[in-house]
Amino acid sequence: MQQLIEEITKEQLRTDLPAFRPGDTLRVHVKVVEGTRERIQIFEGVVIKRRGGGISETFTVRKISYGVGVERTFPVHTPKIANIEVVRHGKVRRAKLYYLRELRGKAARIKEIRR
């Protein structure tokens, strides 16, 4: 039974996404349905966590919008994500960057590394 589940989920996994880690700044292109129309909405921010594995893997992106912190969690393998762009790679020493929630302004910056 477990093999059957693994085979089915393996077909659903996306392979067109770039490699990214917590601390990286992403530009996520999300498909949004409004009535009968479908459009692309861009959500750009810092990856503060990545959890799970396989089909249930998710990541959370945080950005500041008009002075208010906004976090959005996306499943990695969802068809609602049209594209993911890695804007910059950040140098961090933690897997979960929850401490960024308390930091404001320049203190919340993440050092960039060249890859």
Curated annotation (Swiss-Prot):
One of its GO terms (cellular component) is cytosolic large ribosomal subunit. Belongs to the bacterial ribosomal protein bL19 family. One of its GO terms (molecular function) is structural constituent of ribosome. The keyword S-adenosyl-L-methionine does not apply. This is Large ribosomal subunit protein bL19. Pfam families: Ribosomal_L19 (PF01245). InterPro entries: Ribosomal_bL19, Ribosomal_bL19_CS, Ribosomal_bL19_sf, Translation_prot_SH3-like_sf. It comes from the Bacteria. GO terms for biological process: translation. Keywords: Ribonucleoprotein, Ribosomal protein. NCBIfam families: rplS_bact. It comes from Bacillus pumilus (strain SAFR-032). This protein is located at the 30S-50S ribosomal subunit interface and may play a role in the structure and function of the aminoacyl-tRNA binding site. The gene is rplS.
